[in-house]
């Protein structure tokens, strides 16, 4: 039986950076993904939000709390927004090519739900850039990565994780893996609503006795290509793309939150996205335009694109504390009592470098 210090489930930025940090600290680390490596499903990533041109993070913190309907853990929001600038700087030094202004600083724009310009990106290369940087850090620190490994059962005794049983889809074998700590950082259950990836780590932990929380909270992504599972970043609208009815009537988006934009598109008879007048900014979205043309045959440089809102992210999941630990305390009669400070999905992050976005059982 293989024995590891840390096993990480997932293959997105949260999983990659958690694995890299564990290996950097000297732990033998294994990353496992139930799908092929390098496909975290982040095509709709709009960019990273940080108070780069503000005196402090107060406005960012308040915008995040307001858009979360005051249901967020405000201490965690304050901590995350305060450290956002440092994380953007770290990504830049590691090679992420942000778009820049005339002063050489990353360009910030006013994204949906923000009162101030603070969203920076690299166009359609944002998601792939984050993935590549995470993979480079894993290679640098010696993390072993395996794809097509389906987690089946969590092995635990006396509320301590001992390892897991997984199905090796490459060789068709059932394997047992021993570990001292397990980090669950894979997808949510978005695939239950449309064709896509479903995170199996959450299901495995649930069957082991960990109750899930806030599963009723689901976000709908407004810019989904009708009849497909292709999600378009709302950053397109910051570069000049506009929303219309097929008849030409404009759908207002300025200063509105993502919920309001989604509601407007849902109420429209035949909403379309017009990206034909993006000018020089269209060059930053070249790979996205090619993807849409391959999937639908529509050239976004010449044609409008039909839209329909779809479930983009699931917010609920395993209950964790401020450090991302899944804490389970047994109450009277052996029933589980959870004492978390927050509930976060494995990939629900503003800046995707904090290991706190993962769920970790330790012994």
Can you say where each PLM-predicted feature lies in the sequence?
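Glycine-rich active-site loop/strand segments that organize a redox cofactor
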Residues: 49-80
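A conserved FAD-binding loop/helix module that cradles the flavin
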Residues: 190-204, 208, 335, 341-363
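An anion/pyrophosphate-binding glycine-rich loop and adjacent beta-alpha core
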Residues: 204, 210-311, 360-363
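Conserved redox-cofactor binding core of oxidoreductases
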Residues: 92-173, 178-181, 185, 221-228, ...
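Glycine-rich FAD pyrophosphate-binding loop
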Residues: 24-45
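N-terminal Rossmann-like FAD-binding beta1-loop-alpha1 element of flavoenzymes
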Residues: 6-31
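A glycine-rich dinucleotide-binding beta-alpha-beta segment and adjacent secondary-structure elements
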Residues: 147-148, 152-160, 166-167, 287-345
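Short hydrophobic core segments
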Residues: 7-9, 176-187, 337-338
